[in-house]
């Protein structure tokens, strides 16, 4: 009875195992023999040693209803990957107790380790018999084992699929343990793999070499590098440290750079992307940020000399402006202390007020205030210091020309060392400057504000003809903000001027040559329109509370909106903008231009600063 019960349990176990095997291969119909515990080893040809795989479990030898008629499978206990091998005439078995070695048709050598030596010998004998049987059938050329593949097309397809799957699995496991580098054929493996180190070619390909001109064919110093800032015309502060060519070669340089960028905007970017190094970027021309009408004005007028450098593009030697056409080292008098604690709002306010005084300094502007205040004296010094060909300063007026003389003839004071560090981010003004005062319009090469206003009105009319697709106010207003200085350069100027006598001549001596290159038409609204107009009494000017020159913000705001009073009447009149055009232009500039928004914010800070000053009074 015990033997019958044991046989029943074994039979039930075989049935369960057969059902499990049929889930993987439905053509298995009978289990021939079983080995309870085996482990699979593979032989490494390079290391010439055996390596254990992750296949370990029960070995089943079975028969199939399709070809091949026999096979064995190791049901893996460690993972879901089982080892299946069909028994064909190509298998070669060798017994080395407790290992059963075999070599398959792909010449891969495996070793099966048996926990029970008796099972090892029994399974080895069974394998040899089945292999000899397959070899005998193949030698005879006829037999029932080959007929399903040849005669029955449906079973033949299933057998072929099974063989393909087994072969693919064997190749996968073989390649998985192999350490040889394999060729990458999938594009996703190349582009989506973060650990893949891509080689950097020393040269571009032949097609790129043919398409891209050599550096000696163009006058650009580095034509093979095209940065995004140069492509989209954005000013980069890193260009302040580059050396700029003289202004007389501006038109040739601009035409060559524009022709080169029209021909090769994308291919240069391809070559640029092959390098990990950041190339030295040269300053882009300012025409990239200007509207076409301003460019025409710069090209046509013989008296106006457009600058190849703005304050953002030329390296500032000592962070100061120029007087009488010469470079002097700083706006501070020798020995003047640094006022480090100047507030940020005062600096922003002075930067905004500095913008409006460029078009405001008319002959009558110097006589608005009391002569005893520093502002008119500084205006007088302004008119004397803006002669374009003068090398030595004119006779000092009320003692305000003495600091420039000290810097022409003296040395740099120790306080300007930190000033020079800030100055690298901002450029110095050009040697030749145009006067603002109307008394010097008769000199050669000098344009009065009236003539400049006429030219700007001509530009406005030309711009209105081409303004069908965009608002009339989109005349590159942010460039005007950039030319007035951004960020840090004015901070050092304010920090180093403790009193009004030193601040006033500094913020009024500004080169008017920035105006033809960057100014919008005369009807362009300034940011000061949005600020609350406040009148400042002369007492506040004398007490030194104003951060900039002593002229009221309302006068500065209206000077940009109204034509400058001139002795000769203005012939050309311009029509004002409609309310819709003004609304569209302001919305466009606020949404798309950060510099325009910064100017409005600076004007707001300026008004808040003045309100705070009045409260302190």
Swiss-Prot record:
GO terms for biological process: deadenylation-dependent decapping of nuclear-transcribed mRNA; deadenylation-independent decapping of nuclear-transcribed mRNA; nuclear-transcribed mRNA catabolic process, nonsense-mediated decay. GO terms for molecular function: 5'-(N(7)-methylguanosine 5'-triphospho)-[mRNA] hydrolase activity; enzyme activator activity; mRNA binding. GO terms for cellular component: cytosol; intracellular membrane-bounded organelle; membrane; nucleus; P-body. The modification Phosphoserine is found at residues 147, 275, 336, 448, 511. The modification N-acetylalanine is found at residue 2. Residues 205-219 have a biased composition (Polar residues). Keywords: Acetylation, Cytoplasm, Hydrolase, Nonsense-mediated mRNA decay, Nucleus, Phosphoprotein. Its EC number is 3.6.1.62. The modification Phosphotyrosine is found at residue 191. The keyword Hydrolase applies. Interacts with DCP1A. (Microbial infection) Interacts with rotavirus A non-structural protein 2; this interaction probably plays a role in the sequestration of DCP1B in viral factories. Interacts with rotavirus A non-structural protein 5; this interaction probably plays a role in its sequestration in viral factories. Belongs to the DCP1 family. This is mRNA-decapping enzyme 1B. It comes from Homo sapiens.
């Amino acid at each position: 009875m015990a033997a019958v019960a044991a046989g029943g349990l074994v039979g039930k176990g075989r049935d369960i195992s057969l059902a499990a095997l049929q889930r993987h291969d439905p053509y298995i119909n009978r289990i021939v023999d079983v080995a309870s515990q085996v482990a699979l080893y593979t032989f490494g040809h390079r290391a010439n040693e055996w390596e254990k795989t992750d296949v370990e479990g029960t070995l089943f030898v079975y028969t199939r209803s399709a070809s091949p008629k026999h096979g064995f499978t190791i049901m893996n206990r460690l993972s879901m990957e089982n080892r299946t091998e069909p028994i064909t005439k190509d298998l070669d078995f060798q017994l080395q107790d407790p290992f059963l070695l075999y070599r398959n048709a792909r010449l891969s050598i495996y070793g099966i380790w048996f926990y029970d030596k008796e099972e090892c010998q029994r399974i080895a004998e069974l394998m040899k018999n089945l292999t000899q049987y397959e070899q005998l059938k193949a030698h005879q050329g006829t037999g029932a084992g080959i007929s399903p593949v040849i005669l029955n097309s449906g079973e033949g397809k299933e057998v072929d699929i099974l063989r393909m799957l087994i072969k693919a699995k064997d190749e996968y496991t073989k390649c998985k343990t192999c350490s040889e580098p394999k060729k990458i054929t999938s594009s996703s493996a190349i582009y989506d793999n973060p650990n893949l180190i891509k080689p950097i070619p020393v040269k571009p390909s032949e097609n790129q070499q043919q398409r891209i001109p050599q550096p000696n064919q163009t006058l650009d110093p580095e034509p093979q590098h095209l940065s995004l800032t140069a492509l989209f015309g954005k000013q980069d502060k890193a260009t302040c440290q580059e050396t700029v060519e003289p202004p007389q070669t501006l038109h040739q340089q601009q035409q060559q750079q524009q022709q080169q960028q029209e021909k090769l905007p994308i291919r240069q970017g391809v070559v640029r992307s092959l390098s990990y190094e950041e190339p030295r970027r040269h300053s882009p021309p300012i025409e990239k940020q200007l509207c076409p009408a301003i460019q025409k004005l710069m090209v046509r007028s013989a008296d106006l000399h457009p600058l190849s450098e703005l304050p953002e593009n030329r390296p500032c030697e000592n962070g100061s402006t120029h007087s009488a056409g010469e470079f002097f080292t700083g706006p501070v008098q020798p020995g003047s202390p640094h006022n480090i604690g100047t507030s940020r709002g005062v600096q922003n306010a002075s930067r905004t007020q500095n913008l409006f005084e460029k078009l405001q300094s008319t002959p009558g502007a110097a006589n608005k205030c009391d002569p005893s205040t520093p502002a008119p004296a500084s205006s007088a010094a302004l008119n004397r210091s803006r002669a374009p060909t003068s090398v030595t300063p004119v006779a000092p007026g009320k003692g305000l020309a003495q600091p420039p003389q000290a810097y022409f003839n003296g040395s740099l004071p120790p306080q300007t060392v930190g000033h020079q560090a800030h100055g690298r981010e901002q450029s110095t003004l050009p040697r030749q400057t145009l006067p603002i005062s109307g008394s010097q319009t008769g000199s050669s090469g000098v344009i009065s504000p009236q003539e400049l206003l006429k030219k700007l009105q001509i530009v406005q009319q030309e711009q209105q003809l081409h303004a069908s697709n965009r608002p009339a106010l989109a005349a590159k207003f942010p460039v005007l903000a950039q030319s007035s200085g951004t960020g840090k350069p004015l901070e050092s100027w304010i920090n180093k001027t403790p009193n009004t006598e030193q601040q006033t001549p500094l913020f009024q001596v500004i080169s008017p040559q920035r105006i033809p290159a960057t100014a919008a038409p005369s009807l362009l609204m300034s940011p000061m329109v949005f600020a609350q107009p406040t009148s400042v009494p002369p007492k506040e000017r004398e007490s030194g509370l104003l951060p900039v020159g002593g002229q009221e913000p309302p006068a500065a705001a209206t000077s940009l909106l109204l034509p400058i009073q001139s002795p000769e009447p203005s012939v050309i009149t311009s029509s004002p903008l409609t309310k819709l055009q003004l609304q569209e232009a302001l919305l466009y500039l606020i949404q798309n231009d950060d510099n325009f928004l910064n100017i409005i914010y600076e004007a707001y800070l300026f008004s808040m600063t003045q309100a705070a000053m009045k409260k302190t009074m």
